[in-house]
């Protein structure tokens, strides 16, 4: 069995530092790098791409809503054409640094409120996917496991990766429990590891109300924005390897 570990990185901005990128990069195989609209700036983008190169981690674009103040976690009502061009613009910005460092772009994973909005908005999804396809149809689109956007992406001829979340609780319908609700974020590293092993080996996990949710796990999102999160990521990788699950990049998984 094989699985990819991804993390959202490059989310500092100017003098504001967010995340422990160098620490979490030791344990992951794919980096989702902010493209300057919800977080990141040109210096941070290049620094993070170079860090990924030095640590042999694959690079993906992490585009979001143009909302630095809200960190891309606030919904915006976009037309399909706006979404298409917003995505293409951000991918292009990151790709300049990717190319400058002699790398290729592996995937695109939308950020925050945009990621969640795709699950319930087909027109928005099509716009985002058209933006990705405009750039390169061979790039992998990362979306919420077993969700409609992944079906649409496959119908459009794009490669897809089903993403699960290590430290988040699930609703019975397979969506993530809102961060505003109690129990939405799981902090115990042993519980996190057992849930992820269940997702990979058993094809699902118990939802917040105890119902079984079927999931496909191609890539696992882990966090590295505080020392405990890095500790959890290190422990999770160790436990997965102990279970005989090989940690590889999306590029090796998705052909």
From Swiss-Prot:
Oligomer and partners: Forms a complex composed of PxpA, PxpB and PxpC.
Catalytic activity: 5-oxo-L-proline + ATP + 2 H2O = L-glutamate + ADP + phosphate + H(+)
Protein name, UniProt field: 5-oxoprolinase subunit A
Class of this enzyme: hydrolase
Pfam family, one: LamB_YcsF
Disulfide bonds: none
Family, as annotated: Belongs to the LamB/PxpA family.
Gene Ontology molecular functions: 5-oxoprolinase (ATP-hydrolyzing) activity; ATP binding
E.C. code: 3.5.2.9
GO-annotated biological processes: carbohydrate metabolic process
Record bears the keyword ATP-binding: yes
HAMAP family to which the protein is assigned, alphabetical: PxpA (MF_00691)
Gene name as annotated: pxpA
Alphabetized UniProt keyword annotations: ATP-binding, Hydrolase, Nucleotide-binding
Purpose of the protein: Catalyzes the cleavage of 5-oxoproline to form L-glutamate coupled to the hydrolysis of ATP to ADP and inorganic phosphate.
NCBIfam families: PRK05406.1-3, PRK05406.1-5
